Amino acid sequence: MESSGKMESGAGQQPQPPQPFLPPAACFFATAAAAAAAAAAAAAQSAQQQQQQQAPQQQAPQLSPVADGQPSGGGHKSAAKQVKRQRSSSPELMRCKRRLNFSGFGYSLPQQQPAAVARRNERERNRVKLVNLGFATLREHVPNGAANKKMSKVETLRSAVEYIRALQQLLDEHDAVSAAFQAGVLSPTISPNYSNDLNSMAGSPVSSYSSDEGSYDPLSPEEQELLDFTNWF
């Protein structure tokens, strides 16, 4: 019974497939090395072909004919000059050039100004010179101006304004005195009785002017003080 059972179980099992043959380790590494060498050779060949394709393109400008002693690759140089000119005209680079001092290198950058800028600068210099000369002349005519050489322009103008006001006040007083004296000169042409009546009036301006006509001093003490303009400043 047991043998029949084993036979039935053996008949019921399927046969197993044969296992594949595994090569040894040396054969595996040799195969991998051969594949890597083939890949490297293919990569080197493709790189060499690319270099051969790029070589004629690089040598074409060098083998081109020469005109006027310059190579035909002027397009590249002109483009480089344009880029350099654009960079040099930028305001940031111009400011850097102004800050740099090239005297230590033995040369200096040429500074060329347009004609309009040069004329404008010349006019400005002439204007400043005339203004300074005008203030110097005004400083000589104001009181204490000639002695004070360090008087500023504002102080010179202020002193000139005060000096003009003092002269105007003195001129007004002189005109008033002249008008009064003219009235006193015309008084003798009036009738004697009228002149006597006027002289008899005490404190009248006409009597004082007529009585002081012979002994009139052109400059009174008050007027002499007004002439001293240094007291006004």
From Swiss-Prot:
Residues 39-62 have a biased composition (Low complexity). Residues 115-167 form the bHLH domain. Its main location: nucleus. GO terms for cellular component: neuronal cell body; nucleoplasm; nucleus; RNA polymerase II transcription regulator complex. Pfam families: HLH. Keywords: Acetylation, Activator, Developmental protein, Differentiation, DNA-binding, Neurogenesis, Nucleus, Transcription, Transcription regulation. It is found in: Nucleus. Residues 1-24, 39-95 are annotated as: Disordered. InterPro entries: bHLH_dom, HLH_DNA-bd_sf, MASH1/Ascl1a-like. Developing CNS and PNS at embryonic and postnatal stages. PROSITE patterns: BHLH. The modification N6-acetyllysine is found at K153. One of its GO terms (biological process) is ventral spinal cord interneuron fate commitment. Residues 78-87 have a biased composition (Basic residues). GO terms for molecular function: bHLH transcription factor binding; chromatin binding; DNA-binding transcription factor activity; DNA-binding transcription factor activity, RNA polymerase II-specific; DNA-binding transcription repressor activity, RNA polymerase II-specific; double-stranded DNA binding; E-box binding; identical protein binding. Efficient DNA binding requires dimerization with another bHLH protein. Forms a heterodimer with TCF3. Transcription factor that plays a key role in neuronal differentiation: acts as a pioneer transcription factor, accessing closed chromatin to allow other factors to bind and activate neural pathways. Directly binds the E box motif (5'-CANNTG-3') on promoters and promotes transcription of neuronal genes. The combination of three transcription factors, ASCL1, POU3F2/BRN2 and MYT1L, is sufficient to reprogram fibroblasts and other somatic cells into induced neuronal (iN) cells in vitro. This is Achaete-scute homolog 1. The gene is Ascl1.
